[in-house]
């Protein structure tokens, strides 16, 4: 279901899957833990990749060598460029309290999906982000 919501967000923005890059913020199964077992991120990434979407991951709690080969691992967010959507997958402090202004400048369009409902979406919207969240209708921020 979440994969289809993300595809809908991208489609409504006029993006085709083949040219789209998504950045996962977090990968582990719960916040502040470096354990990738049973993570919902892996099947979500696979579902997006099956649609032709490229997936990058930033998770400072997990050893970069343990990620699947199919994802692009980013260890420094200043290197995260050209993404069309950031997805907060895990509510690590490092993923919630990051430099959102800096990340916005590196993205094709500052667009975020809060999969944990922990971000201050109002502040992000004031800073120019298009914000979406689990449980929030897509039409709230066109």
Model-flagged regions — what are they?
Residues 1-142:
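Structural/interface elements that position substrates and couple domains in central-metabolism enzymes
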